[in-house]
């Protein structure tokens, strides 16, 4: 009487390994892009938090302030896990004559890789910079000096960029 063999043949196992390899070839780059996009979004969130500081500073006719952390004042920067956001620029002298979608002269520069966990940042955006112009209506538009690739930007910034 012949015994029945159980299990997979070598060719079946090789086919499964090949299929897993093909799937990984697509999944790993997509996952790396996803990580980079989430880290860029963290920097944009930092910039959103700076909007109120810019509005307060504009009341004094400037974009930046000399904050004293010892007295409870906040400065021109916000640091996140992967990025450092800094307020820069000089307000336009003719703010009253601008339309809501015109830049007001204030900018937020986001530097990736300078956060508290900067060593763990995606290599796709490490050392990259995103510069956002604040518009009169308070929203942001991407500046042409930005080095972050457009595919990593949040949808709102992609649509706002000409």
Swiss-Prot record:
The keyword Membrane applies. Keywords: Disulfide bond, Fimbrium, Membrane, Methylation, Transmembrane, Transmembrane helix. The modification N-methylphenylalanine is found at residue 8. It is found in: Fimbrium; Membrane. One of its GO terms (biological process) is protein secretion by the type II secretion system. Disulfide bonds join 63-106. GO terms for cellular component: membrane; pilus; type II protein secretion system complex. InterPro entries: N_methyl_site, Pilin, Pilin-like, T2SS_protein-GspH, T4P/T2SS_Core. Induction: By PilR (PilR/S system) and RNA polymerase sigma-54 factor/RpoN. The chain crosses the membrane at residues 8-28. SUPFAM superfamilies: Pili subunits. It comes from the Bacteria. Residues 1-7 form a propeptide. The keyword NADP does not apply. Pfam families: N_methyl (PF07963), Pilin (PF00114). Disruption phenotype: Deletion mutants do not colonize the ovine hoof. Mutants show also altered secretion of extracellular proteases and twitching motility. It is a single-pass membrane protein. Major component of the type IV fimbriae that plays an essential role in twitching motility, natural transformation, and protease secretion. Belongs to the N-Me-Phe pilin family. This is Type IV major fimbrial protein FimA.
């Amino acid at each position: 009487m012949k015994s029945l063999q159980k299990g997979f043949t070598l060719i079946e196992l090789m086919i499964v390994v090949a299929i897993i390899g093909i799937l990984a070839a697509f999944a790993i780059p997509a996952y790396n892009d996803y990580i980079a996009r989430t880290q860029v979004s963290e920097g944009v969130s930092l910039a959103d938090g700076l909007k109120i500081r810019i509005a307060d500073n504009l009341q004094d006719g400037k974009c930046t302030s000399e904050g004293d952390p010892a007295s409870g004042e906040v400065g021109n920067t916000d640091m996140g896990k992967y990025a450092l956001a800094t307020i820069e620029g000089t307000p336009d002298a003719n703010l009253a004559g601008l339309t809501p979608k015109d830049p007001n002269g204030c900018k937020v520069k986001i530097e990736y890789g300078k956060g508290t966990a900067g060593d763990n940042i995606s290599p796709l955006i490490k050392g990259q910079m995103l510069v956002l112009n604040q518009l009169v209506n308070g929203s942001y538009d991407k500046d042409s000096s930005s080095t972050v690739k457009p595919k990593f930007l949040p949808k709102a910034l992609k649509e706002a960029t000409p």
